[in-house]
Structures are given as structure tokens and as C-alpha cells.
């Protein structure tokens, strides 16, 4: 299963490196809008995680980090929207010079390809890193805590949903 996830991520990375800035920004806007639109479904999934946290007797601090409510989901949406005006790093020339032989040399930013991210019981990170990886042209493999499995699954489903308008 992990091998398949990795192969799919590499395929996605190949496609992502060719996506233009306008399309990335449209996708980010779509992701942000879907969070707000699907707030009730996200909260329902989060309730399952919170019930499990109660049964596992997790600390109040950890349970608070797991909790998603309308305000926090709006904050996640706002966070994605804040990525939109950021410069797209892909293709930026950071340095250029001419060698002694007359060869033009440039340092150009390019995507890594696939970024793996392991994070704790913070379902909001799912949206944050998805958006940042998209903007930087990278595919991502996310591994969130099992404490917020249902929340992360719902957020992932929302983020991979097809836009309702053409990009």
C-alpha cells in the first residue's frame, strides 16, 4: 500500500510541476471555499475523533488541538486564501551570472517533487501543508495522528474534490 501511495505521489508531482500559478491559485481558492461549504461534514467527522479522544482519556490540551469548530475551520479557509497572493516560487531565478567561458548560469527554483509530512494531532495542518505544497508545485504524502483520523480523511476528501467550475 505504501509503495502504491509513493508511486501515485510521484505521478502527481510530475503533473504538478507544470501547473501554472493562476491554476494553483484557483485550486487554493476552491479548497478554501469547500472548507466553509462543508463545515458541517467536517465537524461531524471531528466529533468522532473527539469521542475517541474522550474514550482514550486524552489530555485537555491534546483534545483542544484536535477540536475543529466553525471558527477554526474558517481560520483554515482564511489560511489557504493567504497563500494565494504569495509569489509562486516555481521558476523564480534567484541568482544568475556569466562564467569565465561566457556560459550563462542561473539558479532557478523548482519543486522537490514529493514532500512527506508527519504531524501530530492537529487536523488543521492537513489544510495548511496541502496548500503550501500545492503552491510550491509539490505533491505531498501526509501522515497525521491516528487521534484525528476521521477529521483528516474528511479534509483530504474535500481537498481532492473536483472544482465546480473549470480551472
Segments the model singles out, each with a brief description of its role:
Residues 1-104:
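N-terminal Rossmann-like NAD(P)+-binding subdomain of aldehyde/semialdehyde dehydrogenases
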Residues 24, 143, 163-164:
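Short, cationic motifs built from Arg/Lys/His that form the positively charged side of catalytic pockets
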Residues 158-167:
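Single conserved hydrophobic/aromatic residue that forms the stacking wall/gate
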